[in-house]
Amino acid sequence: MERNLLKILVIAGLLLSSTSCKKNVYSVKVYGLKSCGNCRILIDDFKDDENIQLHMIDIDTHILAYKKDIALYDGLSDNQAPVIMTKSFAKAGYSSKEYKVLKKAIILGKKPNLKNYYKRRSNYGNTTQ
């Protein structure tokens, strides 16, 4: 019950931090993308930009990565929010097994090897592969 209350409070805080935020997608800041107002949360529906570098992960892991300041995108500087990939990213070739490895690494406070992620990400939308 306390965990659910924490989730609700975190989400409510994120929504209150910027009235321009969409309610259904929460992600963190990355180069080339616009944040919503003054908050550090990036909103994107992943429909119109093939260069998006991150997406939402389950909220518990998202919060944990943020608290541990784990940046999984090499282009981030130390003062920017951590970047995490999502389960739905399997559609671009990022398998659920790799997602579990990624999530476990976040929980343990480690940075996994994302070589395969970047390779597959560059092929996203390519139907001839």
Residue map of PLM features:
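N-terminal hydrophobic targeting signals that begin at the initiator methionine
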Residues: 1-2, 22
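Sec-dependent signal peptide recognition
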Residues: 3-11
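C-terminal motif of bacterial Sec signal peptides marking the signal peptidase cleavage site
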Residues: 17-20
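Local sequence-structure signature of Cys/Sec-based thiol-disulfide redox active-site neighborhoods
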Residues: 22-50
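Solvent-exposed loop/turn segments at secondary-structure junctions
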Residues: 34-38, 60-63, 89-92
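Thioredoxin-like thiol-disulfide oxidoreductase module
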Residues: 58-79, 103-111
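Non-catalytic, surface beta->alpha helical segment in thiol-disulfide oxidoreductase systems
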Residues: 86-126
